[in-house]
Amino acid sequence: MKFFRVVVLATAAFACGGGGGFPDAGVPDGPVPAGTFSLDWALVDLQGAPISCDRVGGVTVTALLRNRAVQGGTTEVFSCGTGMGTTPLIPPGLYDIRFELTGVTGLVATAPEQTGIVISSGQNTPLAPVTFAINAIGGLDLLVDSLKSGGNCAAVASNGAGITAMTITLQHVLGGACEPATLMIGTTPYTIDCATPVEVGCIGKTTPITASGLPSDNYQIHIRGKQNALICYANDDQLRVPPNALSLMRTVNLAATGTAGCL
C-alpha cells in the first residue's frame, strides 16, 4: 500500500510539472479593435435651396446601422444643427446604413441608404454626404377663444368678451420679418399687413382661421381684440408651422390687456 501511494504521487508530479507533461492552454485573443464612421449632412427644400434645421423644426439626425454579420441593428444619433458628426467606436464589419431626420413634429425626412460600408478596425470611415430634401411648406388651422362663456363677440352683459373688431399679424421668430400671408377667416380672405394691421369684425370662437402654403418656420402671431377703439384682448403665442404640407391645429386664447376703459 505504501508503494502504491508513492507511484501515484510521482505520476501526478510528472503530469503537472512545468517542463513536461501536457502543454499549457493558449491565451484567448483579445477583442477585435473597433472603428468609427463620420458623416456630414445638409437640408434643402424641393427646389434644392439650402434650409436650416430650425426652419423645419429638425432636432436629430439618426443613422440606422445594420451589420450584415449580426441580426438586428443599432442607431447613432446626432444633433441636426451641427451638420456633421463621428460615431463612438463600433464593431468592424460590413454595414448598410439608413438616415432619418426627426423634428418636433416627428419624422421629417429620410435620405438614401448607403450600402456595403466597410468599418475597419482602428480606422474612421467617411460616408458620402447626406442630403435631406424637404417640402418646407405647411399651414395653420386656428381657433381664437377669449374664454368667456358667452363667446368672443357677445356683449359683456351677456358674459361675452364684448369684442367688436380684431387684427392679426404674423412674424418669423428668427429675425422678426413679417409674413404677408393671406389667411381665411371662415370663408373670408384676410391679408396680413404688419405695418398697418387690417381690422375685421369680431371673430367667433368657432370660426376657423386657416392658411396654407406658408413657409415652415417658427412664428409669433399677434391677435388684438378691440372694444371700439380700445385694445382689450391680446394673444402673442409662438406657432411652429410644420413642413411636408401639414397644418398646425391649435386654439389660441385671448388674455385681457387690462387697458383702462375696457369692460
Give the ranges of each region predicted by the language model.
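Structured interaction patches on ligand/partner-binding surfaces of diverse proteins
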Residues: 79-82, 102-135, 201, 225-263
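Beta-strand signatures of extracellular beta-sandwich domains
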Residues: 60-64, 98, 167-171, 222
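Short amphipathic, basic-aromatic surface patches that mediate peripheral association
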Residues: 40-54, 144-158
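Bacterial Sec-dependent N-terminal signal peptides
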Residues: 12-46, 122, 129-144, 244, ...
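Short, acidic Ser/Thr/Gly-rich low-complexity loop/linker segments typical of extracellular
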Residues: 68-84, 175-207
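Short Pro-Gly-centered beta-turn/loop motif in secreted/extracellular proteins
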Residues: 80-104, 199-220
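Intrinsically disordered, low-complexity serine/threonine-rich repeat tracts
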Residues: 16-33, 57, 71, 159-162, ...
